[in-house]
């Protein structure tokens, strides 16, 4: 498994505002959208392309286009939905699938409540977006689900992560083509599985359903 932790002042600046408990939901959504676009540059470094020739107003020019089958972007609902537009802005021709998961607060394990994905993902590159990698349960389940359907490699974009969750994903995906791109790697998980210092509940803060 490959891990890339962003090292850029603009990303740190936006993450700082995202963490601030006084940041209102509309601003939080805007920051999450901007952050995933910045992180997507690294996440798409190995996106599959093929050479084409186009005609400029002056002469032919050789360039690149995304290969078929097009990449599949998979937000983990509900919080991952807030990151979808930021990635699709860079890859508008990508397809989108949805995976609905909720963390069981007693077991800290994910429960799948919705799925809308192509049945056959053979030869597909998949990009999973989820704001937080905490225990790793949801991400592990999503990655396994995609590989079971034939995906060839999976790249996950998360705004923040805990070391415990990152280690769990690495152990669970050993031997798989998995890349994790992070805005920041935080200190630890607390006793109930929240990232410290973290940013609270990303879904609640994105959609204004609670204050943390």
UniProtKB/Swiss-Prot annotation:
Record note on cofactor: Binds 1 Mg(2+) ion per subunit. The magnesium is bound as Mg-PRPP.
Reaction it catalyzes: UMP + diphosphate = 5-phospho-alpha-D-ribose 1-diphosphate + uracil
UniProt note on regulation of activity: Allosterically activated by GTP.
Transmembrane segments: none
Chain residues that bind 5-phospho-alpha-D-ribose 1-diphosphate: 78, 103, 130-138, 201
Broadest EC class assigned to this enzyme: transferase
Binding of uracil, residues: 195, 200-202
InterPro entries: PRibTrfase_dom, PRTase-like, Upp_B, UPRTase/APRTase, Ura_phspho_trans
Cofactor: Mg(2+)
EC numbers, comma separated: 2.4.2.9
GO molecular function list: GTP binding; magnesium ion binding; uracil phosphoribosyltransferase activity
Pathway connected to this protein: Pyrimidine metabolism; UMP biosynthesis via salvage pathway; UMP from uracil: step 1/1
Superkingdom in the source lineage: Bacteria
Keywords: Allosteric enzyme, Glycosyltransferase, GTP-binding, Magnesium, Nucleotide-binding, Transferase
Record-stated family: Belongs to the UPRTase family.
Protein name: Uracil phosphoribosyltransferase
Organism expressing this protein natively: Clavibacter michiganensis subsp. michiganensis (strain NCPPB 382)
């Amino acid at each position: 498994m490959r891990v890339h932790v962003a090292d850029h002042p603009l990303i740190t600046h936006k993450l700082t505002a995202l963490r601030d408990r006084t940041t209102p939901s509309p601003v939080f959504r805007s920051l999450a959208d901007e952050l995933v676009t910045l992180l997507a540059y690294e996440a798409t470094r190995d996106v599959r392309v093929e050479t084409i020739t186009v005609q400029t107003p002056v002469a032919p020019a050789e360039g690149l286009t995304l290969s078929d089958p097009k990449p599949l972007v998979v937000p983990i609902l509900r919080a991952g939905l807030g990151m979808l537009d930021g990635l699709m802005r860079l890859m508008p021709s990508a397809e989108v699938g949805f995976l609905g998961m909720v963390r069981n607060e007693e077991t800290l394990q994910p429960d799948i409540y919705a799925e809308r994905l192509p049945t056959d993902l053979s030869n597909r590159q998949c990009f999973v977006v989820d704001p937080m990698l905490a225990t790793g349960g949801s991400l592990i389940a999503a990655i396994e689900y995609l590989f079971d359907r034939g995906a060839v490699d999976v790249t996950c974009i998360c705004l923040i992560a805990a070391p415990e969750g990152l280690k769990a994903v690495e152990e669970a995906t050993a031997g798989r083509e998995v890349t994790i791109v992070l805005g920041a790697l935080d200190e630890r998980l607390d006793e109930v599985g929240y990232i410290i210092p973290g940013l609270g509940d990303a879904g609640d803060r994105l959609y204004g359903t609670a204050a943390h």
